Structures are given as C-alpha cells and as structure tokens.
C-alpha cells in the first residue's frame, strides 16, 4: 500500500460483498461468495477461513435480508477486536426460511425470478451463530454460545461490542423482543456476566435495544434504556444493576462518545420540544452541559456530532430548522471553523423563491390526556381569513416522529409554495421520543390508535377556520401508505382523496422481526391481525378517490401487498387509480421518482386542488 498502487482483481475478487480493514496495521477481512477471507496486508495471499457459505442458505460475515433491514441496519456482520487480534463474525442459516419470489422483467425474452429468504410473521426465522477467529491462527475458531435463557427458543443476535482484545459483549433477544440479555464473555473463562433488561409495557428499546458503551474499567457500561417512568435515559450498569444518571420527561436519543471523564449524548430535553436534538456533556457528578443549545439558536435546533478519537474535536452537524450548517468545534476552547454553510442555497431561497412557513405546536385529541405535537406548513402570504386545501403527510409507524426541526426541500415544499396547499403532520399514539406510554399505546394493535388519531387531528385542523373541509387529502409511503389506506377505509367522511405508496395490506405478509416486535405472532394475536387489514375495508373506498403506487421489485413491502389491495377493491367494485413501477424497489429511485411526483401532482390537481 505504500506504493499507492491499486489492488488487482487477483488480490481482491471483483465482486466482493464486504471488505473491512482492521483498526490497526494493514490487516483486512473480506466476504466473497458468502465466505470470509483474511489478508495480513493488502498484497498478502488471502486465507479462506469459512467454507460453508452458500447463497440463500449459509451466510458468513454478511447479514441476510431481514438482519440487514431490521436488526443491524447495516450490511456488515464482521467485527474486529481493538488491536486486530481477533475477528468476530455472524453466521446466518437461512435453510429453513421461506423464499419470497418476484420477477425482474429487464429486457430479455424471459423475465428473471428473484429468490430471497424472507421470514414473514409467524414463520421460520434465520438461525444466528457468532464465531471468533484468532487472526494469527485462522483455523482456531470458537463459538460464542447463546445464553440458555435465550437459546431455548427462537432468538436474534442484536449487537456485538469488543471491549478489549480478550473481552466481548453480545446482546441477544428472544423472538418476542420484549427483553434483551447482554452477555460479557472473556476467553480465559474467568468472567461470564449477564445483564438482562425487560420492557414493562411493550417491546424493548425504540426499534431495538441500544448498544452498550463501556467505561474505563472495561466491565461496567453506559446504555440508553427506559427508566421506571418509561422515558429513555442514560444508565450506568455495574455488576448487573442499572443506575439512571439522567432523568425527566424527555429522552436521551443516543450516546455519541464515552471518554475517561465524560459521556457525550444527544437528547430532546431543551425547551421541552421532543422534535429537537442537542448535544450534551455529562462529567462526573456535575449537571449535564448542553454544547449546542446556544449555538446558532434560530438556525440549529436539530443537531448531531461526530467526535475525534480522543474527543478533542467534534463536527457539529446542524440539520435545521434553518439551512443545514456543518461546523468543526474545538472541545477544549471556543475555536471553530465552518465547513459548509450553504450560502449559495440561502441566496437562491431568499432572492428567487417564496418559501412556506412552518408552525410547530401541540393539541389535545379525544382518547389521550397528553398534548400531542403537530406541524403545519403554510403557503407564502398565508391569509387566515381564506380557505385552503389540506394534505396530511403521514408515516405513523411505531417510534416514528414527523414533527421535528429538520430543514427539508421536498415535494411537500413545492405543493405548499406553488399550489397553495397546507401540509400538516401529526404525531399521535405510537410515535416515539416522548415516553413509552405514548409509544407503546399501539402495542399488539397496529392499525388502531395511530389511524384514529390522524382522523381526530384533521377534525382539530378544520376547527382552526382556514381549512376547506371539502378539499382534504392524505398521503404516505410504506407505513405511511398503510395508515393512509386505513384512514381512507375508515369511512370517516373527512377525506376526498388519498395516495398510498408501497403500503402494507396485511401484517401477515410483512417480515417477522418488525411485525412480531409490535404484534406478536399471528397465532398469539389473531383478532388484531384480522382487524388491521386494509383489504377488509375495501368497500369504504367507494366514497374517496384512491391512488395506489408500488414497485414490482420491492423486496421490503412486496408487490403482493398492493396486489391484494387491488384485488379487494376490484371485488368490491371500487374505482381507483394505480401506478406500478416495473423492476423498481421500495425506494422508487431514478426516473421513476420524477415520474411518481408528476403523477401525484396530476392526481391532486384532479381531486383535491380544484374548488
């Protein structure tokens, strides 16, 4: 590597699934054909350390579809120890997992069929095993066994954290995901400690349990978890006992950095606004210090930070509500430097365009005692004495948040500024970052309160006096498409039209990890599965204009979901509009995205915008 020459195809296979450098020196590991290879340096001969990899059957070092999407949120399943002495890797066994199959049409005479192991609710899930390789002697491998309390049934491996070169911490979850077991493992057998965490009211964590951050003693650790009042806070865990070190009716979002003297974390404590994010420093017994609350106060209320190795510097990333701003901060003094201030974009927005204004506030709805947050985007030169069409932009999934302080330029911005449509979003029951009581309200009953609350919010919006009650629509993507469809199928009479992009139709059709986290298995919760289907509401769509959009190659929310909605609507003699995007996945990228928004504009102009 000192010669700065590119590696040849002989040295690294041309289609490598993953390549991860060791933290020190020039060692690397890569995955090819679902097997792991080690190299002592970039030009050294590769040593194959697994030999059983097989597509859609046995995967070494990379996750399968459901682990990548729902467990790791990453395509990596290799973890180097701090000094590169050991390499831990995940082995996934998908042998018993049923495949989803769909066609890729391409340009050939015959379509290609894609097969992906995809465990649906109630079905066989992948089997996960964790191994550790001695890099100096790759044939020496040991398995990190799942604890008996978890391993007696189906389970998931959630996180792998190297504490030292000789100590490993692993989090395991039972299939139900209402508890987590953190196991600390030492290779010499002197330490084998377990710490358990169980949710009192629902699933554990927001989407999944947070990772541990180890203290200087390499045994105790810091972790974000729910306190006794159901708010996510920092805890110090020592000898299996968790002690809260922050508290209040707000939440710690995540830990950014742990040093010998300080813990840096992001929370939404400031000003009691759950949609804000600020960076804090907690040192010893002193009160937490907010490092970003007073910086660019009007512009920057949604921040994150990335630290240097010893935390002497950090990059402050400000995402709104003003234009994004990226700044290099000196953690030891006042010095800082602007990395990107978006001045050019600011000039365009202030001199060439009329931008909407955004209001964020709270209101009460029937069925819940706490004030809930909404945001509303108003057209330029808004006049409260006039009536405007309203479009609800919804996601609504568990632990989600639509009312935040992030700057966005998106389709909604165009509709508001150009077509004079008010855009509103509402965080009802099931939404996150405001405590477990609100978030877990939909536990075991998706398709209920998060749907009802959107309808209640619209009634409140109408009472504000400037909404044209005859021109109200809703749209959403993925879970938002599901909520849109459930709302339109409720027969409320409030909505003229709705757009559902890549919606779920039935939770039986979606993946087991996500669905069972909130709904358990179908055989354990039959009525809730039955009552949460879009298809059973098909007859109520006769009174609304409905547009259904889906990609035929969606490997996440399968085209099967839209096909079932379409079939139910046809069987009930409901007229609706549909748009299928050939060979496009869940994101509808490329030219399909432009086509989609043009089509959505046309749909709204036909059904919502005209008086």
Where are the predicted features?
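Hydrophobic beta-strand positions that form the internal "hydrophobic ladder"
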Residues: 25-28, 84-87, 167-170, 220-222, ...
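Active-site-proximal cap/loop segments of hydrolase catalytic domains
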Residues: 425-611
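Short loop/turn segments that connect beta-strands within beta-propeller blades
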Residues: 2-3, 41-44, 135-138, 187-190, ...
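Non-catalytic accessory segments flanking enzyme active sites
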Residues: 88-92, 97-100, 123-129, 145-147, ...
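A flexible loop/linker signature enriched in serine peptidases of the S9 family
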Residues: 12-15, 31-41, 51-75, 90-127, ...
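Signature of short aromatic-glycine-proline-rich micro-motifs recurring in repeat-based ectodomains
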Residues: 61-82, 156-161, 206-219, 305
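Cap/lid segment of the alpha/beta-hydrolase catalytic domain
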Residues: 45, 52-64, 201, 347-478, ...
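Residue-level detector of Asp-centered blade-edge/turn motifs that repeat once per structural unit
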Residues: 23-24, 82-83, 164, 216-217, ...
């Amino acid at each position: 590597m000192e010669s700065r020459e590119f590696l040849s195809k002989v040295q690294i296979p041309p289609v490598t699934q993953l390549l991860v450098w060791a933290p020190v020196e020039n060692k690397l590991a890569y995955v090819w054909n679902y097997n792991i290879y080690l190299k002592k340096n970039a030009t050294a001969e590769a040593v194959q350390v697994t030999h059983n990899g097989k597509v859609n059957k046995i995967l070494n070092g990379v996750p399968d579809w459901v682990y990548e999407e729902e467990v790791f949120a990453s395509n990596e399943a290799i973890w180097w120890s701090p000094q590169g002495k050991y390499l831990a890797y995940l082995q996934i066994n998908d042998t018993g997992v049923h495949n989803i199959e769909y066609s890729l049409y391409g340009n050939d005479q015959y379509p290609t069929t894609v097969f992906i192991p995809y465990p649906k609710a109630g079905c066989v899930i992948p089997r996960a095993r964790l191994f550790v390789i001695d890099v100096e002697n790759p044939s020496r491998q040991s398995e990190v066994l799942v604890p008996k309390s978890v391993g007696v049934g189906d389970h998931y491996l959630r996180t792998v954290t190297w504490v030292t070169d000789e100590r490993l911490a692993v989090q395991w979850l039972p299939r139900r995901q209402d508890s987590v077991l953190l196991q600390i493992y030492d290779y010499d057998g002197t330490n084998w400690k377990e710490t358990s965490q169980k949710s009192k009211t629902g699933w554990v964590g927001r989407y999944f349990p947070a990772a541990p951050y180890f203290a200087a003693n390499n045994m105790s650790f810091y972790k974000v978890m729910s306190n006794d009042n159901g708010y996510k806070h920092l805890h110090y865990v020592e000898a299996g006992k968790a002690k809260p070190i922050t508290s209040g009716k707000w939440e710690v979002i995540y830990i950014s950095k742990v040093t010998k003297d300080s813990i840096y974390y992001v929370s939404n404590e400031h000003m009691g606004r759950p949609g804000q994010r600020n960076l804090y420093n907690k040192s010893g017994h002193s009160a937490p210090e907010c490092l970003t609350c007073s910086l660019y106060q009007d512009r920057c209320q949604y921040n994150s930070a990335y630290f240097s190795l010893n935390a002497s510097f950090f990059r402050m990333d400000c995402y709104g509500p003003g234009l994004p701003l990226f700044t290099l901060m000196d953690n030891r003094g006042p010095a800082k430097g602007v990395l990107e201030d978006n001045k050019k974009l600011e000039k365009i927005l202030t001199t060439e365009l009329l931008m909407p204004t955004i209001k964020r506030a709270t209101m009460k709805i029937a069925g819940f005692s706490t004030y809930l947050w909404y945001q509303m985007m108003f057209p330029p030169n808004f006049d409260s004495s006039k009536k405007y069409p309203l479009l609800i932009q919804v996601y609504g999934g568990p632990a989600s948040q639509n009312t935040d302080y992030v700057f966005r330029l998106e389709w909604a911005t165009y509709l508001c500024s150009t077509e004079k449509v008010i855009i509103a979003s509402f965080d009802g029951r099931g939404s996150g970052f405001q405590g477990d009581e609100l978030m877990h309200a939909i536990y075991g009953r998706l398709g209920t309160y998060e749907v009802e609350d959107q309808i209640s919010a619209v009634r409140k919006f109408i009472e504000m006096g400037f909404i044209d009650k005859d021109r109200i629509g809703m749209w959403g993507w993925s879970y938002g498409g599901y909520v849109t469809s459930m709302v339109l199928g409720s027969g409320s009479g409030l909505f003229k039209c709705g757009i559902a992009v890549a919606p779920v139709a039935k939770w039986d059709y979606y993946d087991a990890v996500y669905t069972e986290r909130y709904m358990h298995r179908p055989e354990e919760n039959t009525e809730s599965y039955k009552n949460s289907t879009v298809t059973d509401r098909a007859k109520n769509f006769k009174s609304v204009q409905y547009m259904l959009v889906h990609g035929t190659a969606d490997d996440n929310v399968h085209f099967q979901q839209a096909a079932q909605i379409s079939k139910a609507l046809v069987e009930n003699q409901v007229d609706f509009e549909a748009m299928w995007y050939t060979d496009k996945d869940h994101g509808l990228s490329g030219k399909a995205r432009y086509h989609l928004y043009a089509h959505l504009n046309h749909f709204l102009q036909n059904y919502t915008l005209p008086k």
